[in-house]
Amino acid sequence: MAREFSLEKTRNIGIMAHVDAGKTTTTERILYYTGKIHKIGETHEGASQMDWMEQEQERGITITSAATTAQWDGHRVNIIDTPGHVDFTIEVQRSLRVLDGAVTVLDAQSGVEPQTETVWRQATEYGVPRIVFANKMDKIGADFLYSVQSLHDRLQANAHPIQLPIGSEDDFRGIIDLIKMKAEIYTNDLGTDILEEDIPAEYVDQANEYREKLVEAVADTDEDLMMKYLEGEEITNEELMAAIRKATINVEFYPVLCGSAFKNKGVQLMLDAVIDYLPSPLDIPAIKGINPDTDEEETRPASDEEPFAALAFKIMTDPFVGRLTFFRVYSGVLNSGSYVLNTSKGKRERIGRILQMHANSRQEIETVYAGDIAAAVGLKDTTTGDSLTDEKSKVILESIEVPEPVIQLMVEPKSKADQDKMGIALQKLAEEDPTFRVETNVETGETVISGMGELHLDVLVDRMKREFKVEANVGAPQVSYRETFRASTQARGFFKRQSGGKGQFGDVWIEFTPNEEGKGFEFENAIVGGVVPREFIPAVEKGLVESMANGVLAGYPMVDVKAKLYDGSYHDVDSSETAFKIAASLALKEAAKSAQPAILEPMMLVTITAPEDNLGDVMGHVTARRGRVDGMEARGNTQVVRAFVPLAEMFGYATVLRSATQGRGTFMMVFDHYEDVPKSVQEEIIKKNSGE
């Protein structure tokens, strides 16, 4: 089958925002206006097309990033709707990794909110061009210009309106297009009848002022335009649009639009802006990767003529077709039934069927081309972040960084029958979500699951019960502490056992030093002259890794430690891998006596929004929870407090804040970094874990 849409006419976009900014409703309207659905589903009624999981419909939030494809103005637009809740940041991150552009949705009453900052930062890291849609212009307190200002103040973004609203709140009835300098007036509830007319007299001065500001801001990014502007020459609409497109794609400029998705106003103009200003796969730099055979960097330009290269960005279990692997094609063509090489795992995979997804319904297709986003059935070994390439032209693309989980729960099956089902269910859920970990405590046999927050684990346990019919008891949430060394030391590990027959002998000297935060464990072999034979070196490293998994103070995994094996001895007959593994673990125990071991706890960046009258309460909450305030900001008659607070102190805070503010206060938190716990807290943790 020939390519239906050229690369120039393809857009891969994400829709991202703070929870409740109206992101899913915006996507729904896009699907409605592009003819994908015939009846609009409302999120608050639990009928949205994109939020297809039962829990999403009950909670009214988006959990997984559903992918869909739509058509507008002769273009194909592949859309990924991403969650706005911080516990699901990996969904946002892996979507951004495979997108070319994004629409950031703001609530026009609140402007930039905490999670907007998080997703904006992630999009900046990945260099994703963005347009901004100030939604909910019909809401009481909606303020378009405040929203634009918040983009400057909180994100330092070079964002400028290319539209202005006509009226706001109940009176929001149309939009001024600052490029055409025309007014678009909505005359029916479905937003399908739009009258283009002259700008109403009372808005002419404001429109002229903001058109001038727009031209000036865009001219700043384009030398030719700047010359024309300074010489007082007229700048045509085509020139202005071309310059906005160029600056947006270069991530130097962010066009801001307005509307109300719920009231069906502004969505078609936003779709026009997606086509006009966001990049096609040809407008962005060619993807880079490493050739696994030569270790050389290679590029894969977006072209059907190039060898096939794609990135798997999401795994999903579908009740009808089984395991689905979502992937983005960067170059080349792929047919169903063909073989690809998973270069990340070094395994050959067969593509059974290829599906084009629409939320959770699907259409089978024979071929995918460069720039497409699709799902494949039949891949057994591929997980999130793996590269899939032509077997003859191997390349490993940059993978997706996965944040470490910070919270854990114990789960136990209610019956023997549930036990087997639970193992399978947890394995499938972990395949889908790289931030969800499943471990078995070796000593107690308990199953421990870890994730990014209470809601994250709550949703996964709920899915285990609903989708896999597993009944399980769930323990209270626990913090994922870590351990480390704060001082350098040298330690000997000596293990000798003689008891008739073959003995055991291992002897090592290891220097331990603290490593940089986030660098993890690093092992260095500095043995000279074979005092420890080469074949036993891996056993020393393995012994350390295994021992560090259960810390030296309270049994938590050790991080950020360097170990240098520099001396030792061996016995010709009695030395073995096991003996050197044990010797290494004894060296770690010995080092703990002088290396100032410390317990680390996850620190959360907490953003609390509360009425001004409750500011004293909020500051008291932060202090009482061992937190420290990082900044404050007044927004109207509310105060926004940003603080770093240990996760251990945040359990149950929602209830405390609710009662202190009569339900008017809200908070969001996201993991920020690990920090040493105070000595008194460390002693309590050690005591608790030793069962005293």
Curated annotation (Swiss-Prot):
Entries under Gene3D superfamilies matching the protein: 3.30.230.10, 3.30.70.240, Elongation Factor G (Translational Gtpase), domain 3, P-loop containing nucleotide triphosphate hydrolases, Translation factors
Alphabetical list of Pfam families matching this protein: EFG_C, EFG_III, EFG_IV, GTP_EFTU, GTP_EFTU_D2
Subcellular location: Cytoplasm
Primary subcellular site in the record, as a coarse category: cytoplasm
Binding-site positions, GTP: 17-24, 81-85, 135-138
SUPFAM superfamilies named in the record: EF-G C-terminal domain-like (SSF54980), P-loop containing nucleoside triphosphate hydrolases (SSF52540), Ribosomal protein S5 domain 2-like (SSF54211), Translation proteins (SSF50447)
Biological source species: Streptococcus agalactiae serotype V (strain ATCC BAA-611 / 2603 V/R)
InterPro entries: EFG_II, EFG_III, EFG_III/V, EFG_IV, EFG_V, EFG_V-like, EFTu-like_2, G_TR_CS
Chain segments annotated as coiled-coil in the UniProt record: none
Function: Catalyzes the GTP-dependent ribosomal translocation step during translation elongation. During this step, the ribosome changes from the pre-translocational (PRE) to the post-translocational (POST) state as the newly formed A-site-bound peptidyl-tRNA and P-site-bound deacylated tRNA move to the P and E sites, respectively. Catalyzes the coordinated movement of the two tRNA molecules, the mRNA and conformational changes in the ribosome.
Protein name: Elongation factor G
Family: Belongs to the TRAFAC class translation factor GTPase superfamily. Classic translation factor GTPase family. EF-G/EF-2 subfamily.
Superkingdom in the source lineage: Bacteria
GO biological process: ribosome disassembly
Assigned keywords, A-Z: Cytoplasm, Elongation factor, GTP-binding, Nucleotide-binding, Protein biosynthesis
GO cellular component, one term: cytoplasm
GO molecular function, one term: translation elongation factor activity
Ranges of residues in domain tr-type G: 8-282
